[in-house]
């Protein structure tokens, strides 16, 4: 998106649903991502055209719901999980961001409350994958253009991010050959076959 927006980082890109979906499609189909093990797509909150378009374009995708402990954030995240399931996507789990922080003196600071991630996970029936503490190192790493897990691996958030990566690799995203054998994969391939047959019939 930076290439599209140009050098003016404060300029708004005012696109409607069709243009957004076309842009997402170009990112997925035309960008040379290289030899990837996983492609993580950070989506905006809510249930917008982008989420619905991705659900259609990536039918064998797992969804990870991110929330803060705040009640309002949980409600938005719960709607995102519901939309994912209505799109026949698997909700793999919940990540709590901006969670409680353990101070050097051992006290705990919970700027946005506690337990919200676990409450959301329980309410939608999925595991809590991680609770990422509110940590200055995350901001410093982001401003430096380097992930906190690499720039500050021993920081509280850096440790949790590395543990979360292990969880995702081991438990969340199955190898592609397993995903293709799942019911969701079978339905996706069947849908592709039907669409191909429909297009061939229209050209005859």
Which residues does each predicted region cover?
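Conserved catalytic-core segment of NTP-binding enzymes
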Residues: 26, 30-33, 37-144
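Short, conserved glycine- and acidic-residue-centered signature motifs
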Residues: 17, 73, 157
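Hydrophobic alpha-helical scaffolding
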Residues: 14, 67, 107, 151-154
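Short coil/turn segments at secondary-structure junctions
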Residues: 8-11, 64, 148, 152
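Flexible phosphate-sensing "switch/lid" loops adjacent to ATP/NTP-binding sites
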Residues: 1-40, 45-58, 78, 160-191, ...
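C-terminal boundary of histidine-terminating zinc-finger modules
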Residues: 144-159
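The feature captures the short pre-catalytic strand/loop hairpin that immediately precedes
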Residues: 1-3, 7, 139-146
């Amino acid at each position: 998106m930076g290439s599209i927006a140009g050098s003016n980082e404060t300029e708004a890109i005012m696109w409607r649903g069709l243009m957004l979906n076309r842009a997402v499609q170009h990112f997925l189909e035309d960008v040379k991502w290289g030899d990837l093990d996983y492609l993580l797509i950070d989506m905006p909150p809510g249930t917008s055209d982008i989420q619905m378009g991705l659900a259609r374009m990536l039918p064998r995708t797992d969804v990870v719901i991110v929330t803060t402990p705040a009640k309002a954030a949980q409600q938005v995240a719960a709607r995102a999980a519901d939309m994912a399931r209505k799109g026949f996507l698997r909700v793999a789990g919940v990540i709590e961001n901006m969670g409680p922080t353990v101070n050097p003196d051992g006290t705990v600071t919970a700027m946005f409350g506690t337990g919200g991630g676990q409450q959301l996970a329980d309410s939608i029936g999925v595991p809590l994958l991680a609770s990422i503490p509110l940590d200055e190192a995350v901001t410093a790493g982001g401003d430096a253009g380097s992930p906190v897990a690499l720039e500050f691996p021993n920081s509280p958030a850096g440790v949790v991010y590395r543990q979360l990566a292990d969880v995702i690799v081991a438990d969340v995203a199955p190898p592609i050959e397993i995903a293709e054998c799942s019911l969701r994969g079978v339905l996706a391939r069947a849908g592709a076959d039907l669409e191909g047959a429909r297009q061939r019939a229209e050209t005859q």
